Amino acid sequence: MVQVDLITGFLGAGKTTFLRRYAAWWAGQGVRVCVLENDFGAVNVDAMLLQDLEAVGVEVETISGGCDCDTHQRRMRTKLISMAMRGFERVVVEPSGIFDVDEFFDVLRDEPLDRWYQLGNVIAIVDALLPETLSPQAEYILASESAWAGKVLLSRCQLATDGQKEGAKTHLARALEACKCSRKFGPEEILAKDWADLTTDDMARIAGCGYRQASCEKLHFEEHDAFASVYFLELGLSRARLERNIPSLFGDAACGRVLRVKGFVEDGGQWYELNATAAGLTAAPIPQGQQVLIVIGEGLDKARLEEELRQ
């Protein structure tokens, strides 16, 4: 049976960054790997960040959001059937940062997928700089995306103090308890380490972490009602202006509650990936990009967002 791994994590936690390392590690073991990248909204920006995986033999398939649950499940099912028929040995699924994992497990239980796929690992990425307070819907997503994890990886540990790392662990435990989930993570199940320092032994342990069955009390809401994505195409703004103005979006209540900003900008003939949360902004060079900026959050005001960006 094809092994299928799930890499979860809330918006901006660092799933795509870890996914690149994880999929490349499996390819280095001689395993034929395919990544199924699922982004929130109608434009899949994260897929462009995985271009370099093709160089190590990893194939990438994508599903864009922006549709109802039934349509999304149908698209995912179709992709998984196609990948199984193409002979991949391992499929790594990265859902969006706003994702009900029950939807994924429901798809895996359907015929013929239940005969072709076996759940391998569930890995949850949690930001070491996780905000102290989230909305009830965001708290539920944090808990439900982590409950089945065989291993939790704290991201951005190199930027966090020991107190912040402990605070992220406590926050996760609190979110799980609020959802009436019995899942508790022991010290050996949480890896708090700069990813640049991950060893081959670390990767082998992560790749064998498995999963734990757990359940959370369901919080019923429509992801696309609770969370929104706003797209800006061909803004024509410089990298310097975007880097200066994007951080202000997170503190401006008139913009709504901004959770993440991501996209691309060209500067001097070089494309850069912009990725921002309330904890900070990064700009990393990439081979190719497109003039798009996506803001994800709650109660967003597009006109106000654009006004702030163009200041």
PLM segments and residue spans:
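Nucleotide-state-sensitive switch-loop elements of NTP-binding domains
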Residues: V2-A13, T17-S135
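C-terminal accessory "lid"/substrate-recognition subdomains
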Residues: S144, W148-L154, Q158-G289, L300-A303, ...
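A general structural signal for short secondary-structure boundary/capping elements
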Residues: L80-A84, L108, Q137-Y140, N275-G280, ...
